[in-house]
Structures are given as C-alpha cells and as structure tokens.
Amino acid sequence: MAETYRFPRFSHEENGTVEPLPLKTGPDKKAIPHIRIVKVGDPPKHGVRYLDVLLLGFFETPKQGPLSGSISDLTESTSYSICGSGSLPIGIAKYYGTDQELLKACIDLKITVRRTVRSGEMIVYMVDSIHAPLLPWSGRLRQGMIYNANKVALAPQCLPVDKDIRFRVVFVNGTSLGTITIAKVPKTLADLALPNSISVNLLVTLKAGVSTEQKGILPVLDDDGEKKLNFMVHLGIIRRKVGKIYSVEYCKNKIEKMKLIFSLGLVGGISFHVHATGTLSKTLMSQLAWKKAVCYPLMDVNPHMNLVIWAASVEITSVDAVFQPAIPKEFRYYPNVVAKSIGKIRKI
C-alpha cells in the first residue's frame, strides 16, 4: 500500500482550469471556427510569443454523387461527409501576429490525410496553402508529418483506405509558453530504477465538463459523489544512503521543499505542467534533465482520455504525491502482448 501527500489547493488553483471550446454552428450547420489560447509559466503579455499549436477538426471524404457526365460536374464544388474527428500537433514556434490571424491561416490550410501502418497504425498528414502567419511552422508543415493514429484520431478505424481524405481545421488550441522549449522527462530517466529508493508519482484528479462514459472513459466517484477522472505521472525518485530508513514525514518534507506549482495547458490536447519553485535534490534534478518546469502531455500519458476531453472544460481538483517503492531492476518490462523468447515465440 502506497503513502500519499495531498498538495494544498493554492498549488493548482491559479492556472489549473481550461475553458471549453464553444461548439456553435452557423447557418450552414457547420461548426464556427474558434481559437483557444492558454498561458503556462510567465509568457510576455504583448508582442512576440512562443506558441505551441494543436489543430483540431474533422476528417472528411468526398460525397459520391451521380455520374451524369455534364459540364456542370466540372464547375460545382465537391461536398464532403465527415468520417471522423482528430487533431494535428504542429509544435512550437516564435509567433508575431494576432490570435485571429493565426486562426484564419489555420482554417485555410489544405490538408490531405492517409491512414497507414508501421509497427502500429499511423496517420500521415500532407499540408498545402501555408499563409504568412504560419511561416514560423512552415518547415515541418511542408515536410509532412506522421503520428500514432490512436493519439490523433478518435476512431482511426473509421478512416477509409480506398478514398481521398482531407482534414478540415475548425479549432485551434494554443499554449503561450514562458520559455522556448517544453521540457519532458526523458523515457530512460522515467524508467530508472535504483536500489534503496522511493518513486515519487503524482496522482492528478480532474473534473471534465463532458460525459465520458459512452466513449470508454469511466469516471471515479469522489467522497461527495461527484464524477472525476484521474491519471498518474512519474516525477522522479528519492534515494537515501544504505541503512537509512524512509518515513512518510521524510518524503513529505522533501516534496514540500520543492514548492511545486501545477497548471493545465493545451499541448497535444490537454497537458499537465509542473513547475518547481523551491529546492530539488541533485538526484531529482538530474532525472528532470536539470529543468524546473516539466510538461506531461495527456496525449502521451493517456491518449484515449485526451481524445475524449480535449475540447471540454477541464479543472484540476486535487494533486497527490504517491510514494511507492521503486520497481526493482530485476522486474522485466513487456511492452508487447507477445513476450519474446518464450516457448516457440521468437522475435524476427
């Protein structure tokens, strides 16, 4: 059984809420485009910003009309039917313009999509019609991008492989950053196991403004009977000298000295940000790659939950530090359902 420590409410109440995207339709019954920007850290209030941008929209295929063979077939615009919803993360860039200029440039993009497979299912994006506001992102947009299908598409199985598919941008999520980079805990360090150490994990509890049960995300009832969602992230490990005894008070004291501040961003959909404003041990600092501000995109932590709540209002209701013995190095991690070198199963 793990020991826990609940962080005070002030650690997440200032920037622990994300407002929902307004899902409104116009006279043509199409969703009205909207841009949503949140701030993480201490970005400049005016002028140049570092923006991480995520495009949200719909996958569409041309409607099959009657083959009349008339000249009007060449002049009439093609109508499309929606076959799914998804996103396109385009990353961080230095941006000089306004929010509305960015929105206009994003919805004017012509994006074609292809569903394919490597070790897992992938979505390929090819982009054209890149206007001036998007020039800071043009390098990666022109090259085309490939993403894990389960991270960027709500139902990749609904995307046909025998039809042309376009991605129509409707919403733009932007995260205005106080620094040029988003620091993530390297996987090798997150998987680090040391003897005589305690793993410090964070249990983040959220309140989402959308019903999630029908989409496969079951909420948990809190003490007041309210439906909440939660996920866990790994912060690091605390290590003591051989022979020293760990106590809950010792671990709590270590955590309190860090003076952690939590916030929500829109990196990859919904993202959880941790900023250490206090003192960190050298062991923990090295695990965080010597950064005091760390980002955990829900797209990486829990992709399906991210797909379900990325357009909704989201609020942090509590954050708990969970102290657990570090998993011994002798334990083998099996990333695949089929374990290699067992019986007649061999890795090719």
Curated annotation (Swiss-Prot):
Main location as per UniProt: virion
Compartments reported by the entry: Virion
Pfam families: Matrix_Paramyxo_C, Matrix_Paramyxo_N
Family per record: Belongs to the morbillivirus/respirovirus/rubulavirus M protein family.
Keywords assigned: Disulfide bond, Viral envelope protein, Viral matrix protein, Virion
GO biological process: virion assembly
Cross-referenced InterPro entries: Matrix_C, Matrix_N, Matrix_Paramyxo_C, Matrix_Paramyxo_N
Function comment: The M protein has a crucial role in virus assembly and interacts with the RNP complex as well as with the viral membrane.
Disulfide bonds: C251-C295
Entry protein name: Matrix protein
Single GO molecular function: structural constituent of virion
GO CC, alphabetical: viral envelope
